[in-house]
Regions:
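Acidic, surface-exposed loops and disordered segments
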Residues: 1-213
């Protein structure tokens, strides 16, 4: 797949087929991801990949915590007006998709995130260095590589609140901080959850050109 097409076409996948992902395919994704940039070439990432019963058990524990703690739905905080308008639009779109699936927005997005959207694989990126920002290019590269190989991903924010539980269940060293949680698998083409692609602003709305004709 041509690179720019992969960037434009990639989207968050929230429903997966019950189809195992071969280890060699995941290794190919991570082989590409390791070339991501990092400050001073520190490469400050450790990756834990779980599937099978371990992945299912983690999802069960996470969603149990979710129902105990009842975190808020997206868009319930405060942000600048332009950001709030985008979040409100996203929320409305996702509410419509959730309704088609017979779920509330909270069940679909919040509980779904903690459930890892029933993905067959979870990828956890951690590091001990405190350089959390350097993980973002690695994860972004991973998402694009997965899309290129026909897999879907969802970069999950909600499970980060349960970093200690994730470390415990996946035997991640205590000195490492969980920086990213990614659901990975083959997209379910028949699910309404995967029909949506959130829009993006045109570059004229956020780019300043200096010194060009």
């Amino acid at each position: 797949m041509e690179m720019l097409a992969a960037i434009r076409e990639r989207k968050s996948i929230r429903a997966f087929l019950r189809k195992p992902v071969p280890r060699e395919v995941i290794a190919e994704i991570l082989e590409a991801s390791r070339w991501a940039p990092s400050g001073s070439n520190r490469q400050p990432w450790q990756v834990t990949v779980a599937t099978g019963e371990t992945c299912r058990a983690l999802a069960e524990r996470l969603v149990a915590r979710c129902y105990e703690r009842q975190p808020g739905s997206p868009g319930t905080g405060s942000a600048p007006a332009d950001v709030d308008s985008r979040v409100a639009a996203l929320r409305a779109d996702l509410e419509g998709i959730a309704a088609r699936m017979g779920k509330s927005l909270w069940e679909f997005v919040v509980a779904g995130s903690f459930r890892l959207y029933d993905a067959p694989v979870v990828v956890v990126v951690s590091n001990p260095s405190g350089r959390g920002g350097d993980v973002a290019p690695f994860v972004t590269t991973m998402l694009l590589a997965a899309h290129n190989l026909g897999l879907g991903t969802c970069w999950l924010g909600y499970p980060l609140a349960e970093g200690a539980l994730i470390r415990e269940m996946l035997a991640i060293p205590e000195e490492e901080r969980v920086r990213a949680v990614v659901a990975l698998g083959y997209p379910d083409p028949d699910s309404p959850a995967n029909t949506y692609r959130s829009p993006r602003n045109e570059i004229a709305s956020f780019v300043r050109w200096i010194g060009f004709d």
